[in-house]
Amino acid sequence: MNTNAMDQYENCPSYGSFDVKSFSDSPIPFTNNNNNNNNNNNNNSICVMPSNYNNKNNNNNNNEKLEPEATLDVLTHALHTLYKSNDSNQRKLAEKWLILFQKQPIAWEFCPRLLLETNIFELQYFGASTLESKLKNEWNECNVEMKSKILNTIVSIIQNSTKLPICCVTRVSVTLTIAVMYTFPEIWRNAIFDIIHLSIKQDINTLSLHDPSQNHFNTDRLLMVLEFLSILPDELKKQDLALCKYSEIQKELKLIIDKIYKFLLSVLFLPINENFEFIKISYKALSAWLKYMLPSNGTMLQSCFEISFTVGQQKVSNNSNGNGNGNNNNNNNRNSIGYPLIDSLALVLEGSSLSIEGQSNGSCYIEAFRYAIEQSLTIFPTFYNEATVMNQDDSKAKPIFNVFVQFISSNNSQLFTTDLIHRCLNLLISFIEIGSRETISLLFYLIDDFKTHTMLVQQDQNILKFFFLKLLNRFLDVSMYPNGKDYCPIENGTNPLSTSQNAQFNGVLCETNIETLLDDDIEQFRSCSSDCLMNIQENDIIPKSTFLKFLIEKLNAFINEKCPHWEQYESILYYIYAFSGGSQDGQLEYVPILLNIIPLIPIKSIPLVRTSIKLIGRYSSFLKTNTDYLAKVVSDLLPALSHAELIGSAASSLLSICVSDKCSTMLWPHFNQILDQIEPILLGPQKSNPSIVLVYKSLLHILHKAPIHELSPLFTRLISPVIPNITDHIPRVKSKDHYNQLLVQLSILYSVNEIIEYDEFATMGANGEFTSPSKHPLYPFFQTTIPIQGQLLKHYKSEFEIIDCITTFYRYMMLYFREIANDFVDEILQQATQSFNQYPIASLLQIISSIIIPKLQPLTITNIKNSISLISNTFINTLKSVILATNNNNKNNDNTNNNDDNNNKNDNNNNNNNNDNDKSNFILDFTITPDITKDYLILITKILKTSPQCIEPNIISTICIYIIYNLTDLTKDKPTTGNCCLFLTNCLSLNNGKLQISDPNGNKVLEQIKNEMNALFESDPKHSYVLVYNILMNICWTPTSIQVTQHFSDVLLSFAIGYPNLLKLHATNILNDPNFIKDKQINPHDKQSFLTNILKSNSTQVDYRSSVRTFSFICNDKE
């Protein structure tokens, strides 16, 4: 903005010196001192709308009448309804009215009234929030006169801020910050000083850091000013205001930054007992400014640290009364701690530490930072020990801890000598050894990113090793199960992981349902801490075996000392488990040691055994080469499967072992023995436990290694009990438990198809057994289970979980047992079709899709054709039924309340009114059932490209018509838009003749489908016109979404290739129509260039998309 334009801001702050008294007393606070005109004070309304005020962003909302009209009483009632009413409909109406009110121009007038003319908190807070929102979103659209009024309003409010609750003061401070960011320094030249002067009774240049008695504050306004100064640097770092000139602000701030620091430091000299809250906020502001911009020289930075340390160590007397404003929330805390500003001091140092790296640090800066670090090393250990050991106060300990984390995170080798780094690390170790779980969690970010901290990585490896082992040792302590819980200790000799192969698990662990899960915060800490140290291990910061060796030695030492606390053993085993993942390089040598010492642990408990079991599952790489250990481990795992608290971990570990090809091969000779031991568990109470599925998978992996002639009887023995468990639930289950049991049994069935593959038995020996798929050992399994699953589909037609299980079974069957499945495809097809027609579910379409392959039997082709016809009819009717039930009323409401985009779409073309009647015959909302739409279109597309003889040609053209006429409604759901556009693109591409099918009959049908598509556009030119019109409208009106625009571009390109003459005819007429997108005010040259580009049918997809995207951007950028 030029200088002449600035002259129009006659009521804005002056650009020269600002008279403090005039600023404080003037009823129009932003009036220049030389201008005594007070006509702007209009009937007590602080912010009166100029007559020519226009808000471009909210034209739509301004056109919508606000009923009832806004008054203080109406606003009070609306807010009371929103927060207090029990009627949800009334709350929604109140919310809608309040949102609409906030977007009205009149809201500017009400904001100061809500803040200053009421004492109702909800009204005041709503006024503050509304003012903030309007300023952030509407400032750039306001004219000069309006901006002047807004600035006057804001300053009038802050002059009266003593009447506001503290949370409202904060919101108004944010508003003031936004106003300053928009106006400083071009419009409001002295904004920072003007605001600071609200809280001092002297010129800022006369403030003294050497003689605080010369400083005089206006404490009534000090809180607002300090809040503003604490918020401004954070908002400047975010840089999220449009059209805000951040570089200009930063340039100007560099000239005055020392005075800002001087003011904030002078506040610290106020008597602490009476001004505690002011001092706290001043520390907060100092921290924020140190993160954003350091003082101009090291001397001021040194003073900042010195004063902060001096004041931060002051002790508050027991009769402290706060700041005089009645805010005594922290008094009790201050009295009990004695040094209440230590955490504030830490906050300042933390802020400064973020500036150590990346600053142009001269020697003066380095000396100031070194002073801060040396002082921190001296004073903080005492306060940290007091906070953690004596008071157990994390709120005080965490900021101190984080100061040193931030210090050593900075890569400033000029500041941090090797000796200084070692001192910081040693101090951190002492903090870690007594720190709480929450406090030492602050190290996670540093450890995660440790490799990037060159200064730390280059330290002596022995020092780093010592540091990380100390850290791990503390992790063990703070991640133990809490003391005092009864976890049912286990008697010696009943451990499921004893080395004796004859050990029995007789239920001594627990007879009652005792919760043995970790607290969430401990579990999360374990996960994060182990991940961090794994990064250290994997990045070779220390030798890979360091942690594992330390843990095993510690475990062995505890065993030798006969430590009586199972929690300590369990914690060690957890971290061994965590470090046993990954590549396991150099770890396998420790496995036999662990397998031998774990049974020697003198005390057992359920959590301890569970962790031991989980650990064993990590060592399949070792077990696959050691038959004896493998047999012992599996034998010891099996008894744990009978215990509800252990079956999950035991089943998971067993599966981890059995998925190893070598382990399952080694276990196959013992299959009968294993099954003998497990069978009572499979048939007992645990059969409804979801973990039992993992047990079946483990056994199937072993059975997978059986010779073909031995497979059938063992498979039958394993799976046959599952069948009655399923048939017992037909027709329907009566309880949730029975329902869950049914899901478990169905999961077992599809595990068979997942693990055992037919292809592995296709090639037999010289005798040529099983040349027919019907003689395969699993053929009877499918003969039995497929009819049962058909019954389940009938009786559980709306149960998604059960349908998904059956779908998974059939899909795996088609994938891995196609030779066998060919005998059952017609039955499976009938089941899926009937079920879909009864209750449409997307996954049922996936079953039919899995059946489609290039070569099918004639009967199967006929059945699929009939199925697709029925499914298509059901699909269309389902969408129509929803439309008939809800769309008529909703559409009328949408047409009334819709945004300008949709209103303009309806007015852009004279012919569009005629299209409405045509569209009414084809109204469908494909986004109502996005999953069904997706799987239906995938199914039809697969048939089109694989076996077109499986579909009636008119189905393709019918679906295309429905999509064409509803293209403009698709954009509310991007995935559905993509699916529909891809289908339409494939269908339109048929005319280019590139799609060919190996089956001659398929090609004939494909030709018929192509003729249907041609006839579709030739019989009625409106169809092709609507296609082109809707595509162009979406391109022009869709917000700049690259993905959506590309979908429409591909449809247009396929139409350009297949039907170039129709595209030229319609696109030319539409784009040359002056009423088309008239409100966009598009340059005719841009329209013509776009038309030329989209008619190039020989363009590549990339070039075509680029042309469409460019025009879409032009259209949407003009809004």
Curated annotation (Swiss-Prot):
InterPro entries named in the record: ARM-like, ARM-type_fold, Importin-beta_N, Importin_beta-like_NTR
Positions of region (Disordered): 29-64, 890-916
The UniProt record lists the keyword Plastid: no
Transmembrane regions: none
GO molecular function: small GTPase binding
Location relative to the cell: Cytoplasm; Nucleus envelope
Residue spans of biased composition, Low complexity class: 32-44, 52-63, 890-915
Renumbered ranges of HEAT repeats: 223-266, 336-375, 395-434, 503-542, 545-585, 588-625, 632-672, 717-755, 832-851, 852-888, 931-968, 1082-1119
GO biological process, alphabetically ordered: protein import into nucleus
Gene Ontology CC: cytoplasm; nuclear envelope
Swiss-Prot/TrEMBL keywords: Cytoplasm, Nucleus, Protein transport, Repeat, Transport
Span of domain Importin N-terminal: 94-160
Source organism, top-level taxon: Eukaryota
One Pfam family this sequence matches: IBN_N
Record family assignment: Belongs to the importin beta family.
Function of the protein: Required for nuclear protein import and mediates docking of import substrate to distinct nucleoporins.
Subunit details: Forms a complex with an importin alpha subunit.
Annotated protein name in UniProt: Importin-13 homolog B
UniProt source species: Dictyostelium discoideum
Phylogenetic lineage: Eukaryota, Amoebozoa, Evosea, Eumycetozoa, Dictyostelia
